Amino acid sequence: MRWPPWASESQAQQHNTKPPIEHNEKEHGSKSKSWESSVTAIDWAAFAEPRTIIPTVILTSGFLGAFHIHRRYLRRFPDAGSITPSHFRRRSLLGRVTSVGDGDNFRLYHTPGGRLAGWGWLPWKKVPTSKKELRDKTVHIRLAGVDAPELAHFGRPEQPFAREAHQWLTSYLLNRRVRAYIHRPDQYQRAVATVYVRRALDFPIPFRRRDVSYEMLKQGLATVYEAKWGAEFGGEAMERKYRKAEWWAKLRGTGLWKDFRRNEKEWESPRAYKTRMGLEEAVQPRVESKK
């Protein structure tokens, strides 16, 4: 029936259908509001329950602990410049010696964690062997507390016993695992370190830990570092130990100390050699410019 009587039939139909739609919208809105409020209340209550909190705390702690362990113990340093200051005088680097450049420095491929972390037996943790693979991936180490005779380089002649020192250090360290206690970086982007090595055929005690700098001084293949600036021994006790080893080698006339007593005036230490070469190179350009 049309109502009001003067309304058309189409208008009456629209009027009759509006209330149910509005009623449905109101009903749907109230249902959605009640659903949202109930979901919110249930979620917050679940988060506060021990069965939710305990696994979350354990998982988060485990993740943070793993990150801390990896960053502190398993992080690999590709070169000396990447070593963080927190390692200086506190931590050590374990790695394999890939090359020996001179009588008192070498290259180390850092293998954090050693065999326990998979180095040497896991397929993806192999130490590279080719020069191409090792490029920009090794730490340049300078032995602390010692100065070895200089090999011929940069146009400078070879110093007596330089080849013997280089050969000895190569046979003693090359392809072996060593532990380097880092003291500080030097002006040549090297890490000055006290280095220890264990050798299976070490008489009389196999696998005894040996201080490489100390062994070189005993063999008479290096002198105690004499420079006024930049000398690093790793402490006063180590300096006394090194000077005592040098004194004994000098007394026995071992290695580069062989002719020290007979020809002390002309005998030249590695430090004196470097100083003389530096002075000659400084004077040479002036002479050439005058010509």
UniProtKB/Swiss-Prot annotation:
Region (Disordered): 1-34
Residue ranges of the TM segments: 53-69
Record's keyword annotation contains Oxidoreductase: no
Superkingdom of this protein's organism: Eukaryota
UniProtKB keywords: Calcium, Endonuclease, Hydrolase, Membrane, Metal-binding, Mitochondrion, Nuclease, Transmembrane, Transmembrane helix
Protein name from the UniProt record: Probable endonuclease lcl3
PROSITE patterns: TNASE_3
GO molecular-function term, one example from the UniProt record: endonuclease activity
Family membership noted in the UniProt record: Belongs to the LCL3 family.
Basic and acidic residues biased stretches: 20-34
Binding positions for Ca(2+) per the UniProt entry: 147
Gene it is expressed from: lcl3
Biased composition (Polar residues): 8-17
Group of enzyme by EC: hydrolase
Topology relative to the membrane: Single-pass membrane protein
Keyword check for Protease: no
Predominant location category: mitochondrion
Database matches in Gene3D superfamilies: 2.40.50.90
EC number assigned by the record: 3.1.-.-
GO CC terms: membrane; mitochondrion
Residue stretches making up the TNase-like domain: 91-259
Entry coiled-coil feature ranges: none
Subcellular location: Mitochondrion; Membrane
Active site positions, chain numbering: 142, 150, 190
